[in-house]
């Protein structure tokens, strides 16, 4: 005959014995008649399943981590603004006097005389080929035809002025020089009928043609030297021979 009547009856006895706090050995025999005697407690069972996560705890204090290595140097920044000018430096010492080359006064005088002689020859050549000299005036023409304003500009470029005869000799010299009618440095642009030179001085010598000046076209403010040596008033915008005078 088997010691345990049946397996289900045995399990029932084990459960009743595990969860009863006041059941003694005698009671257990009454409940489980198949159990002969009370034994010692059995071994612990396997751990149960993990429970649910608890509530979030408070934030902890920062940790004391290790300091990292120093990184490489950064790029150079843009240049700054220029600083203020410094104070002037101390004055330097006075230098030694310079040495002037020894000049031979006699040699300088001879060279100066030779230069003056050469300039006189050049002046004669110019007078013979291009111009006329009367007293301290030298008259020259480039043979070009242009307006009065352009003649003034041309003469001023060479530090000269438009030819203005102040006597019969100068008027005759200009007449012999020109082959075309030429402007003179005389005008009444400022005051009609009152002809003056380019400085503004009134004329002390005139040689008007018959019936001139007549201002025929109401704008004849400039003066022309005709081939016969007489003067005629003409518009300044007309083109005639350029003639300059150089002081000598």
UniProtKB/Swiss-Prot annotation:
Residues 112-130 form a coiled coil. Residues 134-245 form the C-type lectin domain. PROSITE patterns: C_TYPE_LECTIN_1, C_TYPE_LECTIN_2. Residues 42-99 form the Collagen-like domain. Hydroxylation on proline residues within the sequence motif, GXPG, is most likely to be 4-hydroxy as this fits the requirement for 4-hydroxylation in vertebrates. GO terms for cellular component: collagen trimer; extracellular space; multivesicular body. InterPro entries: C-type_lectin-like, C-type_lectin-like/link_sf, C-type_lectin_CS, Ca-dependent_lectin, Collagen, Collectin_CTLD, CTDL_fold. It is found in: Secreted. The modification 4-hydroxyproline is found at residues 47, 73, 79, 82, 88. Residues 43-111 are annotated as: Disordered. Keywords: Calcium, Coiled coil, Collagen, Complement activation lectin pathway, Complement pathway, Disulfide bond, Hydroxylation, Immunity, Innate immunity, Lectin, Mannose-binding, Repeat, Secreted, Signal. Pfam families: Collagen, Lectin_C. The keyword Cell membrane does not apply. One of its GO terms (biological process) is complement activation, classical pathway. Residues 49-61, 93-102 have a biased composition (Basic and acidic residues). Oligomeric complex of 3 or more homotrimers. Interacts with MASP1 and MASP2. Interacts with MEP1A and MEP1B and may inhibit their catalytic activity. This is Mannose-binding protein C. It comes from Trachypithecus cristatus.
